[in-house]
Design a protein with these regions (language model features):
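Short, glycine/charged-enriched secondary-structure capping and boundary segments
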Residues: 22-24, 54-55, 124-127, 150-153
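Soluble, non-transmembrane catalytic domains of enzymes that act on hydrophobic metabolites at membranes
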Residues: 2-47, 105-108, 112-113, 130-131, ...
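Active-site-proximal region of nucleotide-activated glycan assembly enzymes
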Residues: 126-166
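Short, well-ordered alpha-helical microsegments
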Residues: 17, 47-48, 118-120, 144-147, ...
Length: 166
């Protein structure tokens, strides 16, 4: 039997996304040896346009040295309507890279551990493959998750705590 391909969407921005993806991968390998192959993809670095492709370097400095502007961006884009508008802009801006990701990395299951990647990547996979891969959104924030994290069209949305769910 051919192993199922699992693609993890993450970025090394310092928010624990890689650690979450690696923990899920390790658990799956332990529980289902040989059933899956795994690939971790740093979406910001490999598939987003400038200056977003620099986010792994920019983001830690931004949240530590310009926290007020980060918080403003969080608040301006949080909420159902505001996040939908922001995501529509992101989808258009990132479209080419997300299509390239879907073409270069065919998947049976896509697991997003970064809130900004779920919608644009899911949209690209839906348009580029003969079938739609299963899509799992993993919320990594324990308390105050952004609206982007809760992807309504995902097959599963895994939320770590009741506080994050509420």
């Amino acid at each position: 039997m051919t192993p199922k391909r699992v693609v993890f969407l993450m970025s090394d921005t310092g928010g624990g996304h890689r650690a979450a993806a690696e923990a899920i991968r390790a658990a799956m390998e332990c529980c289902y040896p040989g059933v899956y192959t795994f690939e971790l993809v740093d979406v910001y670095r490999r598939y987003t346009p400038f200056p977003m492709n620099l986010m792994p370097e920019i983001y830690p400095r931004w949240v530590n040295w310009a926290a007020a502007s980060w918080e403003l961006g969080f608040r301006l884009t949080d909420g159902r309507r505001r996040s939908a508008l922001a995501m529509a802009v992101i989808n258009r801006w990132w479209r080419r890279g997300m299509r390239r990701l879907a073409a270069e990395r065919p998947a049976d299951v896509v697991v997003s551990v970064h809130s900004l990647f779920s919608r644009p990547v899911m949209h690209a996979y839906n348009q580029s493959q003969a079938f739609r891969p299963r899509f799992v959104a993993v919320v990594t924030d324990l308390v105050s998750a952004h609206a982007f994290a809760f992807e309504k069209d995902a097959d599963r949305c895994l939320i770590p705590t009741l506080a994050a769910y509420e």
